[in-house]
Amino acid sequence: GLDEVIVVSTFSSEQSDVVPRLGAATAGYLARCLGDQQVLDLSWGSTLLAVVDALAPQNLPELRVVQMLGGLGRLESETYGADLTMRMAQTLGARMRLLPSPGIVSSKLVRDALLEDVNIAETLALAARADLAVVGIGSPIAGSLVTETGILRVSELVELRAMGAVGDIALRFFDGDGQAVDHPVNDRIIGLDLAQIRHIP
């Protein structure tokens, strides 16, 4: 169950109004929760950009900020996971651990080969032991960030919806009961899976 819920009031349902308020609320929550010796996972997306923008500077030199999903979207994008991880670590005066790989690759064969790299494997192992994770929740609809940035094809989102997908966390799609949707895209992702994410407090 949930230990704490923060309700954010907005004047409209427009993303330009909702996202900054979500970011500020999350940044405030993190200010209460973060401490040295912790591991903080970070995914990617426009909401997480708002969180990073709203964070107040801190000095947490033993905190480690870890990129939990490989790079997605355009390299110059502000919502790119590595950029968000670096910015958050700098703001918090913390150390960072980047995941040196794409977030999604062309095949399971490529994914499996990359997972044998020691740097990738060690980063994912550290991410799996995190004390806290900051993630966005995506929606499998045309026009979402995953299609706008070319990460997934619209046809793949159609397939995912047909299989019951209602959202995703770090590209791991889930159904209305919160269970993982078994789609071939899972075999191409370099990042934590839903089972690992669930074990993060």
Annotated model-derived regions:
Residues G1-K108:
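N-terminal active-site beta-alpha-beta segment that forms phosphate/nucleotide-binding
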